[in-house]
């Protein structure tokens, strides 16, 4: 370990008199910093309940672009006047503790390395780091109760000694990817909730409800068969009957019985009309469920709110037996890619799509065939360069498809590659409802469709919900992450089953932050851009350019030009200047 790198890691040096930072004073690039440059600020003194931290690395994200474009009108800035109360971008952050307030001495220590979990809530309100709370595009700043005392506790994750600075920052985007394959949906009837059971009129089928009917506090029955009425009356729940309802009356009873919040759990028995199912689906509460139980397909595709699948975690489930409860539970409702099968990633050429592909290829029990779509031939070539060797290394196959230039349709391509079976899993990485709906058409009847990218609530699309109860198809979506998701990425990195550093495509010093954000707008680099705020005079440079421009750093890159801890050490040895 070089002397400069050793001093940097230990934080045993005199702090500088000032810290440089990129404040955001409004919408637009012209409001980032002062005159297009970072500003100097005095390094603040920490109170008894605060940490003074050094920012080591910051990943640049398209979410930063959204904040830059919207300014104070961004949903997580609550119409703040940024010219008076500026914020600071940077939510993918790795940091080192410099000073510890005396009330925190038992929890933190100088030199401790941490990653930020930025998806912060306080009293149920989003106060995200890098949004509401000024973020990491600075050299030093204070951390207090706004990060340490949140609804989820302290939003700081201690780093393993083997973790590099860049890969520690990238735990955040990688955590979002991992979260897409963890169970976010509620899969059992809600305790104390409101359940609505809808049956076709004059139905005498002897349905059962082997477990879970004792959970709701209120059960609403609409044209329920006698068997269900009997089961409901045997519970402690309040039972309400509303029969002979037309679809235009559904919203009225939702307002009456749920204050417009929607039903926590809805059960539809022997559904036949896709239109009716679609109308009912609009009334699912946040994190609510719609359980379809029947043996015959609907009369068409169902219009589903794609935004709510992603942001509200609504769950569609079902089965073809007479036991309503057979639809519930994690065993029946998967969230992970199928081992040894086929996974399709739609719009996979961007940094996040690349992470999904990498995870699938490195997953020990991952899919055997990975299909990636992208409309840019340049990005497709990047995917080939990055992942063809990785696929070969893990004895997997990767196929690439450009729908704009191919002679066959996307569906025909997938069907040809899967012997007309369709894909087991389809992950949509771009926020376009048409592509989300198209993803449903290439899926096996028992496949899984994952909406990783979000579209606004109210964005509708047609899907085949008959497959939910006839074949156990899954429809899922996720937004954000937890600190446990970041921790799981670190655990896999330590175990050698995931390489976050492979996502790094370009690096830069503090002064390049604005250019780095512009590069994301322009899709200039084929992966993540990482800023090192403690380094001055480092231009924004792609890893492909290092061989010619910084050969001593390039020499430390890993296979396939992967960013490594050794490259990071060489970078710090060359550029970091210990404060005088």
Spans of model-derived segments:
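ADP-ribose/adenylate-binding Rossmann-like module
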Residues: 268-271, 284-301, 425-430, 441-460, ...
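NAD(P)H dinucleotide-binding glycine-rich loop of Rossmann-like/cofactor-binding domains
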Residues: 79-82, 91, 118-195, 316-319, ...
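Residue-level marker of beta-strand positions
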Residues: 92, 112-113, 140, 289, ...
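C-terminal hydrophobic helical "lid"/dimerization subdomain
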Residues: 2-17, 246-256, 260-261, 265-282, ...
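Rossmann-fold NAD(P)-binding glycine/threonine-rich loop
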Residues: 275-278, 294-313, 437, 453-472
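Glycine-rich beta-strand-centered segment in the early N-terminal region that forms part
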Residues: 42-59, 73-120, 135, 160
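Mid-domain Rossmann-like dinucleotide-binding core that forms the NAD(H)/NADP(H) cofactor-binding site
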Residues: 163-247, 334-404
């Amino acid at each position: 370990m070089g002397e400069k790198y050793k001093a940097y890691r230990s934080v045993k040096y005199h702090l500088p008199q000032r810290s440089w930072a990129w404040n955001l004073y409004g919408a637009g690039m012209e409001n980032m910093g002062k005159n297009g440059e970072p500003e100097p600020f005095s390094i603040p003194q920490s109170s008894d309940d605060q940490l003074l931290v050094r920012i080591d690395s910051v990943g640049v994200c398209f979410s930063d672009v959204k904040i830059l474009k919207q300014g104070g009108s961004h949903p997580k800035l609550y119409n703040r006047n940024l010219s008076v109360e500026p914020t600071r971008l940077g939510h993918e952050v790795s940091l080192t503790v410099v000073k510890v307030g005396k009330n925190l001495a038992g929890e933190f220590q100088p030199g401790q390395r941490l990653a930020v979990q930025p998806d912060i809530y306080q009293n149920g309100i989003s106060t995200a780091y890098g949004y509401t709370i000024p973020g990491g595009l600075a050299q030093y700043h204070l951390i207090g109760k706004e990060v340490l005392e949140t609804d989820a506790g302290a939003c700081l994750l201690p780093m393993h000694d083997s973790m590099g600075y860049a890969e520690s920052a990238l735990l955040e985007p990688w955590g979002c990817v991992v979260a897409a394959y963890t169970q976010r949906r509620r899969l059992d009837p809600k305790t104390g909730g409101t359940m609505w059971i809808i049956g076709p009129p004059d139905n005498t089928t002897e349905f059962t409800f082997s477990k879970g009917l004792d959970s709701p506090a209120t059960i609403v029955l609409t044209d329920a068969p006698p068997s269900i009425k009997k089961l409901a009356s045997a519970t402690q729940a309040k039972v309400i009957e509303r029969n002979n309802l037309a679809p235009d009356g559904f919203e009225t009873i939702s307002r009456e019985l749920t204050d417009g919040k929607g039903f926590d759990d809805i059960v539809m028995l022997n559904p036949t009309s896709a239109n009716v199912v679609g109308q009912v689906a609009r009334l699912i509460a946040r994190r609510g469920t719609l359980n379809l139980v029947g043996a015959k397909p609907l009369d068409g595709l169902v219009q589903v709110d794609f935004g709510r699948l992603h942001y509200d975690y609504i769950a569609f489930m079902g089965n073809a037996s007479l036991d309503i409860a057979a639809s519930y539970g994690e065993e029946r409702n998967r969230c992970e890619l199928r081992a040894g099968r086929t996974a399709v990633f739609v719009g996979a050429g961007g940094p996040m799509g690349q992470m999904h592909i990498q995870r699938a290829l490195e997953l020990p029990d991952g899919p055997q065939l990975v299909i990636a779509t992208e409309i840019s031939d340049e990005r497709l070539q990047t995917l080939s360069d990055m992942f063809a060797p990785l696929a070969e290394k893990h004895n997997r196959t990767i196929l690439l498809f450009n729908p704009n230039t191919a002679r066959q349709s996307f569906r025909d391509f997938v069907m040809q590659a899967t012997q007309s079976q369709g894909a087991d899993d389809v992950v949509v990485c771009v926020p376009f409802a048409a592509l989300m709906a198209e993803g449903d058409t290439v899926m096996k009847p028992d496949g899984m469709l994952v909406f990783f990218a979000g579209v606004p609530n109210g964005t509708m699309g047609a899907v085949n919900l008959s497959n939910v109860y006839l074949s156990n198809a899954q429809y899922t979506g996720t937004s954000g992450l937890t600190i446990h998701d970041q921790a799981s990425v670190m655990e896999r990195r330590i175990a050698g089953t995931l390489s976050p550093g492979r996502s790094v495509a370009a690096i830069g010093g503090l002064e390049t932050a604005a250019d780095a954000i512009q590069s994301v707008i322009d899709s200039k680099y084929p992966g993540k851009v990482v800023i090192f705020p403690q380094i001055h005079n480092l231009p924004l440079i792609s890893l492909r350019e290092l061989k010619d421009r910084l050969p001593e750093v390039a020499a430390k890159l890993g296979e396939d030009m992967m960013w490594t801890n050794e490259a990071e050490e060489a970078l710090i040895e060359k550029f970091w200047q210990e404060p005088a």
